[in-house]
Amino acid sequence: MTSVLQFDKVTYYYQSGEQKVSILEKADCSFEPGKLYTIVGPSGSGKTTTLTLAGALEAPKEGRVLFQGKDLKDIGYTNYRNRHVAIVFQAYNLLEYLNPLQNVLAAMEITKNEIPNKKQRAEELLLCMGLTKEQMRRRIQKLSGGEQQRVAIARALGTNADIILADEPTGNLDADTAQGIVEIFQELAHKDGKCVIAVTHSQDFAAQADVVVELKRHKLQQRREQNV
């Protein structure tokens, strides 16, 4: 199957004082549609930075990140972010003056993708995340951390992007809710054909991915595909 996202000899580093700290060194990795990937590795190894490169929030120092075979520089970083990728980071970046339903609808309005029946779809996503209709209309500040995380995930899913990126999406959730998130990601990949890439420390989550990508020695190493 053709890759939807590809790292082609990507090198990335940052400066810490006079020291250059390497994250990736000529790293290659391909991600296909219709699969759930997890990225694993030690704390501080650069897993979140890898997501920022995949989401065009950072650019490689060397090498290329490709979407459907085209360099993101040629597609345009803003166009790529607005149309093709949705990101859930640990800092949820929710609009606190809006309620959960309005947050999801706001993301739907910003995306360049066509989304029919926006309000109905937004409500369905929030219900799938375990929020009640009453909670959908609460101010964000009145929700727990776990509830806010679910809203952030629903907001990303509502954009109908080709690629879903998530940084520790089950980190603040109880076991049952976390499993529900994993199953939603699996459905997005297997039924909707999305490419879902999640950073996780959870062995349970990683075990349920189609492919595990390990960040090791500044390379992205794909383990063999798992039978899930």
Predicted regions located by residue number:
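Conserved ABC transporter NBD signature motif
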Residues: 63-72
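Catalytic Walker B motif of ABC-type/P-loop ATPase nucleotide-binding domains
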Residues: 164-167
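Conserved ABC ATPase signature
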Residues: 139-143, 147-149
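ABC ATPase NBD coupling module
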Residues: 72-86
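Short coil-to-helix segment of the ABC ATPase nucleotide-binding domain corresponding to the Q-loop/switch region
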Residues: 98-107
